[in-house]
């Protein structure tokens, strides 16, 4: 019989070990954020790391109802699907690189910048010349106008989550290299395009500074967003069931006629 092995946990009759430590030695002793570090990095976070990761997760807990990932969740909830189905709709709608995938892309951008060994200004110029997106910057709601310093500082002040996290980073005297580069890119990009830092850009710098790897970036976004999805699911239960069908019943006569004509021609009808 095939056997699965792991070097980080053991479960037996009456015992559970996580990285060699009995689970009862962790329950009541570690916070959830500390357990994340313990599981993913086999270490306890420094006080400033724990405070910052906690703050980041809190910042994700409210996105309103305009975010694409909330749509699938809310539609599922409206037909009285269980919360698990709504949560899966939320996660499925979030998987694309232009939504939750943006955090991982932003983290990989920062890694590439470090590998290239060029300045933030050179990185921005290269990406713009190539017509490539710089992940972690720009937002459909939180905008600013282009301009040279000191107006470039505005690009850190548009998104309230960015504003709060960077203020906390300054208060904690954050010395991480990746967050520093995020802010440098932000200033350079703002001067050229008036594009501000967004929450993914700040998070990319912070998470890399804290030692987390890009391939698990989705973990943090899902952890932070699920409470919001649960609240939306509960709210939808008080609405009229299946109320979103109205969005799907508007006929497009032009489209229908085109399709009908193509079908008619393919069947040898009038030309």
Question: Where are the model-predicted features located?
Answer:
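Non-transmembrane, aqueous-exposed alpha-helical and coiled segments at domain scale
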Residues: 1-271
């Amino acid at each position: 019989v095939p056997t699965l092995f792991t070097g980080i946990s053991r479960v037996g009759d009456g015992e559970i070990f996580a990285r060699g430590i009995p689970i009862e030695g962790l329950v009541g002793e570690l916070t959830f954020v500390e357990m994340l570090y313990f599981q993913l990095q086999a270490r306890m976070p420094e006080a400033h790391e724990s405070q910052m990761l906690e703050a980041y997760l809190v910042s994700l807990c409210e996105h309103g109802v305009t975010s694409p990932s909330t749509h699938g969740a809310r539609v599922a909830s409206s037909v009285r699907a269980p919360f698990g189905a709504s949560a899966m709709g939320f996660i499925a709608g979030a998987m694309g690189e232009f939504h939750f995938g943006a955090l991982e892309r932003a983290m990989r951008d920062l890694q590439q910048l470090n590998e290239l060994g060029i300045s933030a200004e050179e990185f921005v110029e290269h990406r713009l010349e190539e017509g490539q997106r710089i992940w972690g910057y720009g937002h459909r709601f939180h905008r600013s106008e282009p301009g040279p310093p000191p107006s470039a500082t505005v690009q850190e002040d548009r998104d309230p989550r960015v504003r709060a996290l960077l203020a906390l980073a300054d208060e904690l005297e954050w010395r991480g290299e990746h967050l520093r580069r995020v802010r440098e890119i932000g200033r350079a990009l703002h001067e050229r395009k008036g594009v501000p830092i967004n929450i993914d850009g700040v998070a990319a710098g912070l998470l890399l500074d804290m030692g987390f790897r890009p391939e698990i970036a989705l973990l943090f976004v899902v952890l932070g967003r699920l409470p919001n999805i649960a609240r939306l699911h509960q709210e939808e239960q008080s609405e009229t069931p299946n109320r979103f069908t109205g969005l799907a019943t508007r006929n497009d006569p032009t489209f229908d006629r085109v399709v009908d004509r193509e079908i008619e021609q393919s069947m040898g009808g009038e030309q």
